[in-house]
């Protein structure tokens, strides 16, 4: 195992914004990245881009100064999930996630896999209920709880297992901060600046609303990546968040 410092060569940002990179083309992705400043956001790399371009793509983003949220949502037997999380830590990412529905043994194994990395370990976050899911989707899976209640149950299990926080909808953030405390990190997709298209997300909020609700890190995709001036869009979002703080 090679222990890799997670931030020694990268810029430090206080922004809660994490930009979701969703590109089919590597050159287009890098052209976008070269327009923005790592002091203004972190970047999220998901399944499609990681499968297409591999760990080297993550390394290239890190070399440009960006902290990386590796959004692969590991969900497997405990041993396999633990090795995958350790591999992400070896890569030096800032954050990695697993599915809370993988259960307590899987999450505990993932957490234990990061112990050797010490202070250089990435944040370990669990996914509760995907923001695209509604009550009818859960019912199809035999879950009779509402998305909010089911997410809270999974978040409680996540905290019990010692993880750093959860991915949840912004609507759940107020309740989660009350129940799980300020140190339990909340990462929220489905964030759209005022006037943006909701896209394929069902439960959305503006950045200002998310900050007020207690969200620690907010994932924003197309409103930034499809902007004619993404650098200015990021600066405007961050300025608005600072005014709202």
From Swiss-Prot:
UniProt pathway: Pyrimidine metabolism; UMP biosynthesis via de novo pathway; UMP from orotate: step 2/2
Q: Its Gene Ontology molecular function terms?
A: orotidine-5'-phosphate decarboxylase activity
Q: Which domain of life is it from?
A: Bacteria
Annotated catalytic residues: 73
Its keywords, alphabetically, are: Decarboxylase, Lyase, Pyrimidine biosynthesis
Give an example GO biological process.
'de novo' pyrimidine nucleobase biosynthetic process
Q: Which Pfam families does this one have?
A: OMPdecase
List the InterPro entries: Aldolase_TIM, OMPdecase, OMPdecase_AS, OMPdecase_bac, OMPdeCOase_dom, RibuloseP-bd_barrel
What GO cellular-component annotations does this UniProt entry give?
Answer: cytosol
Which EC class heads this enzyme's classification? lyase
Look up the EC number in the record and give it: 4.1.1.23
User: Catalysed reaction(s)?
Assistant: orotidine 5'-phosphate + H(+) = UMP + CO2
Binding locations of substrate = 22, 44, 71-80, 131, 192, 201, 221-222
- List, alphabetically, the HAMAP family matched: OMPdecase_type1_B
What family does this chain come from, according to its entry? Belongs to the OMP decarboxylase family. Type 1 subfamily.
Self-association or partners: how does it assemble?
Homodimer.
| Functional note | Catalyzes the decarboxylation of orotidine 5'-monophosphate (OMP) to uridine 5'-monophosphate (UMP).
Task: Write the protein's name.
Answer: Orotidine 5'-phosphate decarboxylase
Q: Which organism is it from?
A: Escherichia coli O6:H1 (strain CFT073 / ATCC 700928 / UPEC)
Q: Taxonomic classification, please?
A: Bacteria, Pseudomonadati, Pseudomonadota, Gammaproteobacteria, Enterobacterales
Q: Name the encoding gene, please.
A: pyrF
């Amino acid at each position: 195992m090679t222990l890799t410092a997670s931030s020694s060569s990268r810029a430090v940002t206080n922004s809660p914004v994490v930009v979701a990179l969703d590109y089919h083309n590597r050159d287009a992705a890098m052209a976008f990245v070269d327009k923005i400043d790592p002091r203004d956001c972190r970047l999220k790399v998901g399944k499609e881009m990681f499968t297409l371009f591999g760990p080297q793509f993550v390394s290239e983003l890190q070399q440009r100064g960006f902290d990386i949220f590796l959004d692969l949502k590991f969900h497997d037997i405990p041993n396999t999930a633990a090795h995958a999380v350790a591999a992400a830590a070896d890569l030096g990412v800032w954050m990695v996630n697993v599915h809370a529905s993988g259960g307590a043994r899987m999450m505990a194994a993932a957490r234990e896999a990061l112990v050797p990395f010490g202070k250089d370990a990435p944040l370990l976050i669990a996914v509760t209920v995907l923001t695209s899911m509604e009550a009818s989707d859960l019912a199809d899976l035999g879950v009779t709880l509402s998305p909010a209640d089911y997410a809270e149950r999974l978040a409680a299990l996540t905290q019990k297992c010692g993880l750093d926080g959860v991915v949840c909808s912004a609507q759940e953030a107020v309740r989660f901060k009350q129940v799980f405390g300020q140190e339990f990190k909340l990462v929220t997709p489905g964030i759209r600046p005022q006037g943006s298209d909701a896209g394929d997300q069902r439960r959305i909020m503006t950045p200002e609303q998310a900050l007020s609700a207690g969200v620690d890190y907010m994932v924003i995709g197309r409103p930034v990546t499809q902007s004619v001036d993404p650098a200015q869009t990021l600066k405007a979002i961050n300025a608005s968040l600072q005014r709202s703080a």
